[in-house]
């Protein structure tokens, strides 16, 4: 059989065209040293800051990943996310070309996940349809809208004196064992039926404490709208550092789609300590209190992502799918102080970043005033605009009464005979202080809170014994629920008294009637 030259050339051409000679270009390097979860890698010339690096798989076949944090002249300093015992000198490290991402979306609601969004509650896999990067730029000034919608915590002392609005950052600060977590959990429980998705980020806490929080949320039915991100004390410093950003990204998913979300960081002191540990192991120069120079930026870039975004931003983000809706992410960061020292490095940083703070005091807590809020130095810089008309109108006198009471109580210790006006002021203050006490996991509705504040404002409690004030309040709430349900429904819906004064008259009548029967 003889082939002519044209056929031969056609055959060669077709063979060449069918040849798959593709090559996969990947940037890779070699492990130089491994110490305390910090890996030095030689090579990786094109690596990005914060890029995920792929390390050899562990014995169970799960791939190991790290985060490139230090980009030096001849090596890269990376921190391992998870176990690092199986990594040794000479191992190959590959660039992934991706920044660290976590799963986001409604599939995460009701689940407990780790800092990487992997389930740790034993309820099976999370089939999230989307992932998103943990480090994002916060919305700009043009994309934002002013805070004017309330985020009710259900706590009398907070909603009346330091109100929180949707999209605000309100710091909860105090010594250990002063009820900081309790305030945050009550705020989450009170969002039931309010259309707010909650994210609770536990950083550096004991696993048993996190378990107790999850149990409390389950019992209150709050896990139906809550995601728990847990980086316990037993996990690496890198996981504790990353967890806050992971939780924030999960919250931003809802914010950017015109929904409301609430995120609690419990607590950022431990996150700062974890970041300090990572930074010192990476040989970064230490500054004040041995924290690295960018510890302010650590918290500012996180908390600036909590915002209320306008309808244009939401419409542009969703490509026109969601119109005319604003979204919000409200942040409640927690900071633990040492012996009440709010002028330490991390507390002052976070105070300057947030829109106000709720200061909890050990002395008040030990005196049985719980929540132990110090009304004098607790402020809300933007929440006043978001307060409901009902609570705003009734709470004006509360802070003044308390402030005057604290001042007079200090002098009254030394005075033997007090004039009538001073005694009245002291009596009113004692009753207000007693009335602001509230048991844990029992947030109040706006209507019942309004009724309570109305009672003290109009002087109905002036002749009730201080020890019976809380019993009076509980009895009044029960009486209003059974006999004046329609009034409570109106107040809850309108969040204000009617202009004709009928609601006010009915409430006065109801309290007077109840008081006659109260023994």
From Swiss-Prot:
Major place of residence: membrane
Key words, A-Z: ATP synthesis, ATP-binding, Cell inner membrane, Cell membrane, CF(1), Hydrogen ion transport, Ion transport, Membrane, Nucleotide-binding, Translocase, Transport
Any Gene Ontology CC annotation: proton-transporting ATP synthase complex
Catalytic activity: ATP + H2O + 4 H(+)(in) = ADP + phosphate + 5 H(+)(out)
EC assignment: 7.1.2.2
Site (Required for activity): 378
Membrane topology (UniProt): Peripheral membrane protein
Record-listed ATP binding positions: 174-181
InterPro entries found in the cross-reference section: ATP_synth_asu-like_sf (IPR023366), ATP_synth_asu_C (IPR000793), ATP_synth_asu_C_sf (IPR038376), ATP_synth_F1_a_nt-bd_dom (IPR033732), ATP_synth_F1_asu (IPR005294), ATPase_a/bsu_AS (IPR020003), ATPase_F1/V1/A1_a/bsu_N (IPR004100), ATPase_F1/V1/A1_a/bsu_N_sf (IPR036121)
Top EC category: translocase
MF terms in GO: ADP binding; ATP binding; proton-transporting ATP synthase activity, rotational mechanism
Keyword Zinc part of the UniProt annotation: no
Protein purpose: Produces ATP from ADP in the presence of a proton gradient across the membrane. The alpha chain is a regulatory subunit.
Subunit (UniProt): F-type ATPases have 2 components, CF(1) - the catalytic core - and CF(0) - the membrane proton channel. CF(1) has five subunits: alpha(3), beta(3), gamma(1), delta(1), epsilon(1). CF(0) has three main subunits: a(1), b(2) and c(9-12). The alpha and beta chains form an alternating ring which encloses part of the gamma chain. CF(1) is attached to CF(0) by a central stalk formed by the gamma and epsilon chains, while a peripheral stalk is formed by the delta and b chains.
Entry similarity comment: Belongs to the ATPase alpha/beta chains family.
Protein name: ATP synthase subunit alpha
Gene source species: Acidovorax ebreus (strain TPSY)
UniProt lineage: Bacteria, Pseudomonadati, Pseudomonadota, Betaproteobacteria, Burkholderiales
């Amino acid at each position: 059989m003889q082939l002519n030259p044209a056929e031969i050339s056609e055959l060669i051409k077709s063979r060449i065209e069918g040849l798959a000679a593709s090559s996969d270009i990947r940037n890779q390097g070699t492990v130089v040293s491994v110490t305390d979860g910090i890996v030095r890698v030689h090579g990786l010339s094109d690596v990005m800051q914060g890029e995920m690096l792929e390390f050899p798989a562990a014995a169970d076949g799960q791939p190991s990943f790290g985060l490139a944090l230090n980009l030096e002249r001849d090596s890269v300093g990376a921190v391992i996310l998870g176990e690092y015992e199986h990594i040794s000198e000479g191992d190959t490290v590959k660039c992934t070309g991706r920044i660290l991402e976590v799963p986001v979306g409604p599939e995460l609601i009701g689940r407990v996940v780790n800092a990487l969004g992997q389930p740790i509650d034993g309820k099976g896999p999370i089939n999230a349809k989307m992932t998103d990067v943990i480090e994002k730029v916060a919305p700009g000034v043009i994309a934002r809208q002013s805070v004017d919608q309330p985020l009710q915590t259900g706590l009398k002392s907070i909603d009346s004196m330091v109100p929180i609005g949707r999209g605000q950052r309100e710091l909860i600060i105090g010594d250990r064992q002063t009820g900081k977590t309790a305030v945050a959990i009550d705020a989450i429980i009170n969002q039931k039926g309010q259309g707010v998705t909650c994210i609770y980020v536990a950083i550096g806490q004991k696993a048993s404490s996190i378990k107790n929080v999850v149990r409390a949320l389950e019992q209150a039915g709050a896990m139906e709208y809550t995601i728990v991100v847990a980086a316990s004390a037993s996990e690496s410093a890198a996981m504790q550092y990353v967890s806050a950003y992971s939780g924030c990204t999960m919250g931003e998913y809802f914010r950017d789609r015109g929904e409301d979300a609430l995120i609690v960081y419990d607590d950022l002191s431990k996150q700062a300590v974890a970041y300090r540990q990572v930074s010192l192991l990476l040989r970064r120069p230490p500054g004040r209190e041995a924290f690295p120079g960018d510890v302010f930026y650590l918290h500012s870039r996180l908390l600036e992502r909590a915002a209320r975004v306008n309808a244009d931003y939401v419409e542009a983000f969703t490509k026109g799918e969601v119109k005319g809706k604003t979204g919000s992410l409200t942040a409640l960061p927690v900071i633990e102080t040492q012996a009440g020292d709010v002028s330490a490095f991390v507390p002052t940083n976070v105070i300057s970043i947030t829109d106000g703070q709720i200061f909890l005091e050990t002395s008040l807590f030990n005196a049985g005033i719980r929540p132990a809020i110090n009304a004098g130095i607790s402020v809300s810089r933007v929440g006043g605009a978001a307060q409901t008309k009902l609570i705003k109108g009734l709470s004006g006198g509360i802070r003044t009464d308390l402030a005057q009471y604290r001042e007079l109580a200090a002098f009254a210790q030394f005075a033997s005979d007090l004039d009538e006006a001073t005694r009245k002021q002291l009596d009113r203050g004692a009753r207000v202080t007693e009335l602001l006490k509230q048991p844990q996991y029992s947030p109040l509705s706006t209507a019942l809170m309004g009724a309570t504040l109305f009672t003290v404002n109009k002087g109905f409690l002036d002749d009730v014994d201080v020890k019976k004030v809380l019993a009076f309040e509980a009895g009044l709430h029960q009486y209003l629920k059974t006999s004046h349900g329609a009034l409570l429904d109106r107040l809850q819906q309108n969040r204000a008294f009617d202009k004709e004064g009928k609601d006010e008259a009915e409430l006065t009548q109801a309290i007077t009637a109840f008081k006659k029967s109260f023994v």
